[in-house]
């Protein structure tokens, strides 16, 4: 191995180590990303109204809240009334801010009678990756 290659390899190892130390420290301090999964069952007779309210809430949250990183809504195949939300927040503070936002409170009030079942799943992020569109 040449000296130059060894130096490059060493620098890469140091940079990788620093990256992982920072990631671990952020996770331990609670400063890492928060990922939530919500499982909902919507009253089939109100499904279209629910989708409209959800669309408005997601679009507003993404536009005005810098700590809201992703909000994805999907339905279970062949069961459109079963909705799954995948939410990623910059950190716990961003999640709490989202819960207190006027648009989220409006969404909750507006959809309260539409939601038959809500189950929140706490997660522990392992690896989060995405690609720019």
Mark where each language-model region is.
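Short amphipathic alpha-helical segments
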Residues: 46-68, 103-106
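Short, glycine- and small/hydrophobic-rich beta-strand elements in well-ordered beta-sheets
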Residues: 59-84
């Amino acid at each position: 191995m040449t000296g130059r290659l060894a130096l490059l390899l060493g620098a890469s190892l140091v940079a990788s180590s620093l990256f992982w130390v920072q990631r671990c420290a952020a996770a331990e301090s609670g400063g890492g990303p928060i990922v939530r999964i919500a499982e909902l069952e919507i009253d089939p007779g109100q499904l279209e109204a629910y989708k409209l309210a959800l669309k408005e809430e997601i679009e507003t949250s993404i536009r005005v809240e810098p700590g809201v990183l992703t909000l994805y809504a999907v339905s279970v195949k062949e069961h459109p009334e079963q909705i799954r939300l995948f939410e990623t927040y910059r950190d716990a503070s961003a999640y709490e801010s989202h819960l207190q936002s006027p648009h989220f409170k409006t969404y909750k009030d507006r959809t309260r009678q539409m939601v038959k079942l809500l189950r929140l799943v706490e997660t522990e992020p392992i690896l989060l990756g995405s690609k720019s569109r």
